[in-house]
Amino acid sequence: MRIVQVCPWFHPHVGGVESHVASLSRELVRRGHDVTVVTSRYDRSLPEREEWDGIHVVRAKTFAVWLRTPVAPATKAVLAGLEADVAHAHSPPPLTSYYAARACDRRRLPLVITVHCDVEVPSALGPLVESAYRRTLEPATLRRATRLVVTTSAYAATSRAVWRYNPEVIPNAVDLRRYRPDVDGRPVRERHGLRADEPVVLSVGRMVPHKGLENLVEAAQHVPYARFLLVGGGPEASSMRRLAARLGVADRIVFAGQVGGEILPAYFAACDVFVLPSVSRLEAFGIVALEAMATGKPVVVSDIPGVREVITDGKEGLVADAVNPEDLALKIRALLADDKKRAIMGRAGRETVERSYSIEGVVDRIEKVYADAVGRASA
């Protein structure tokens, strides 16, 4: 099958959706499908076309990035020029999916849309802009989907956007061949000056407001015997460094910056506890928590829809009130204090990912959605 994945950002841009699309595309290629990723050319130094891990990548001309959204109407022309059996768009940001919906509608190409989270219109734009978006662009995109997918049932039940479209729940997935308990984390500890005998708390994600890193930095005050390893870059990086200095914890927090996907498994292997402190519905799944679980690490995750559905509180990890740094610290301390509990939770996490979130199992379900979409379009 000729499959086109359409997403706002892709390699070398780092993020949860980018990671999911890459894993999905690799597995589809492994199964013999022809996969093209259409994405934005947000950086003009990137090639318009390239082959990456067996995937064709085409980058559409991008005029600007506005409110973290690539403005690339050329996506429509790129899609119009590709031979394809089905397209699969990933949202948000919303414009890319809208471009895909318009292009697929014109050429009667079946379209699957995965809504990874709700679109949050910045309050600074005012309620009229949000109302206009909810009444125009959002339904104009979603109603053109042949099939609609969301990543958790909790998100489907609480989303303002998708519930009326009867979406299918298919979670994000992890490549269990890359994320394994036997990955060696010692080189990462050595690289960042972390002793073998000191507890390490890891968080991975873009440094943007909805990730809740401010609360994690504040929580570090209440776990004075641990080191915190923060992986990722973004507009909040400088303010997080300043906050760490102001709170007197800068010497215990390592800002590792952006890390390439090829070495990311070793970062998970280097930690004792993984924390996902997100505070907003923009984090509707949290694939990094699955990656930590696949590596055999216990996790502390936020008590928000979607994210908390990935674990059973007390089994693979603990659920915390992420807007309360003291509660976050309490859950971190509880895990660091009990080696046996961490080991049991780590094994349980690996088993959960193997059972419900393997890339092979998820792609089995996605292939059925593609086949159904193609069948509906030709009926």
Residue ranges and their predicted role:
Residues 19, 199-222, 235-241, 326-327, ...:
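A conserved mid-protein helix/loop that constitutes part of the nucleotide-sugar donor-binding site
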Residues 41, 154, 173:
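Carbohydrate-associated surface elements
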Residues 110-112, 120-140, 157:
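Nucleotide-sugar donor phosphate/pyrophosphate-binding loop at the beta->alpha transition
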Residues 142, 258-259, 266-271:
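Short alpha-helical donor nucleotide-sugar binding micro-motif in glycosyltransferases
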Residues 241-259:
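Nucleotide-activated donor-binding/catalytic signature segment of Leloir-type glycosyltransferases, i.e.
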Residues 294, 298-301, 311:
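Short hydrophobic beta-strand element within catalytic cores of glycosyltransferases
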Residues 312-314, 318-325, 334-340:
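Conserved acidic donor-binding segment of nucleotide-sugar-dependent glycosyltransferases
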Residues 327, 334, 341-355, 362-368:
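A short, well-ordered alpha-helix in the C-terminal region of glycosyltransferases
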